[in-house]
UniProtKB/Swiss-Prot annotation:
Gene3D superfamilies in alphabetical order: 3.30.70.360, Zn peptidases
Active site per database record: 75, 134
Enzyme Commission number(s) of this protein: 3.5.1.47
Protein name: N-acetyldiaminopimelate deacetylase
Gene Ontology biological process: diaminopimelate biosynthetic process; lysine biosynthetic process via diaminopimelate
Record's function text: Catalyzes the conversion of N-acetyl-diaminopimelate to diaminopimelate and acetate.
């Protein structure tokens, strides 16, 4: 039985990096993970897959003297991005890339699985390989379909996410809300088209859409507590086909984010009311779609998070920083609404942000990240208190 080393983790990461797959299509990734897990099978391990969520995998390790069941979650999907890193082990799937570091997340989860296949844990341990974090709300789907019922329900859940802005191998979290809750905004402004020379005979959806986009910026500045914060950003707008034609319709899309559930609901209500008012004032139809409920704020349990922070701050071999809240969204927040837990950042030291086609993770982060997680889990299992 050998301890995990950098070369093994690096191999996992590079092999996974080459086969990125988007939400609910992670079949090669699933097969890769399942092959590794089955090769480490022990009598005290149970590997679970389900037809209703075919790319998900759960691994249950029966503890030797359990007082709790600890859960560890990793996401497994990639993004629809054409990789532009030039790496020797770049994506082999055109138009798809692990641009959010889920290859690194999976690597550390595999490292934990291999370790606990060689060292039976004291507490029960569940490792959840979750599909569809970037889209399709995989965490919510898994929870709502009953994947965590009975012995498969953790008493507490942990997870990690890469952070390019932190030094490689640095861990970071806080006892509170780490990530924002998000809602996806889609708007259709339906007016009346016509000749651009006669705007008075049309109901110009371009002008109305522009006015609506500007008005939406007041949602944060005038309806949200400045301490709580929020974001309304429009990233897509489409309308028109000729310079001398007023179109019938304009479509735009964006994201709405808040650090609190109440703040998010306030923002969604204001967006709907502003759209309704503009529709009446301009005698047009404005259809607003706001998809929320899956990407809730990632609210770390304060007691468990304090334990994580205290443990990591006391370890001489762990570099730890207290985190600041981020407007990043993560569907782990949905699981944490039902099961207490903690998400952490892992620094991967790159000048390119998450979701960049040029994101190049510093692989020296992987081993210290894995070792910190393993050390914390072993310490947690050695404590008898419920929280």
């Amino acid at each position: 039985m050998s301890e995990m080393n950098f070369e093994t983790l690096q191999t996992f990461r590079r092999e996974l990096h080459q086969i990125p797959e988007t939400a609910l299509e992670e079949f090669k990734t699933h097969d890769y993970l399942l092959t590794k897990l089955k090769s480490w099978q022990q009598d005290y391990m149970t590997i679970k897959t389900v037809e209703a969520l075919p790319t998900a995998i759960l691994v249950y390790f029966q503890g030797t003297n359990p007082v709790r069941t600890i859960g560890y979650r990793t996401d497994i999907d990639a993004l629809p991005i054409q990789e532009a890193t030039g790496l020797d082990f770049a994506s082999q799937h055109p138009g798809k890339m692990h641009a959010c570091g889920h290859d690194v997340h999976m690597t550390m989860a595999l490292g934990l699985a291999q370790y606990f296949s060689q060292h039976q844990p004291k507490d029960n341990l569940i490792i959840f390989f979750q599909p569809a974090e970037e889209a399709e709300s995989g965490g919510k789907v898994a929870y709502d379909m009953g994947l965590f019922e009975g012995k498969w329900r953790p008493d507490e859940f942990y997870g990690i996410h890469d952070q390019p802005n932190l030094p490689a191998g640095t861990l970071s979290t806080l006892a509170g809300t780490l990530f924002a809750g998000t809602a996806e905004l889609k708007v259709d402004v339906i007016g009346t088209g016509g000749h651009a020379a006669y705007p008075h005979l049309a109901k110009d959806p371009i002008v109305i859409a522009a006015e609506l986009i500007i008005q939406l910026q007041t949602v944060v500045s005038r309806s949200v507590d400045p301490i709580a914060g929020g974001v309304v950003s429009v990233g897509v707008i489409n309308g028109g086909f000729a310079n001398n034609v007023i179109p019938d319709q304009v479509h735009f899309e964006g994201t709405v984010r808040s650090m609190t559930r109440t703040g998010l609901e306030t923002m969604l209500t204001r967006i709907r009311k502003i759209a309704e008012g503009l529709a009446i004032a301009n005698e047009v139809t404005i259809n607003v779609s706001l998809e929320s409920g899956s990407y809730l704020p990632v609210e770390n349990d304060p007691i468990l998070a304090t334990q994580v922070i205290n443990f990591m701050q006391k370890q001489s071999d762990i570099n730890f920083e207290l985190a600041q809240p981020a407007m990043t969204g993560e569907d782990f927040g949905y699981l944490l609404q039902h099961i207490p837990g903690v998400m952490l950042w892992l620094g991967v030291n790159d000048s390119h942000p998450l979701h960049s086609a040029q994101l190049t993770i510093d692989e020296s982060a992987i081993l210290p990240g894995y070792n910190a997680l393993k050390s914390f889990l072993l310490w947690r299992m050695a404590t008898s208190e419920e929280k």
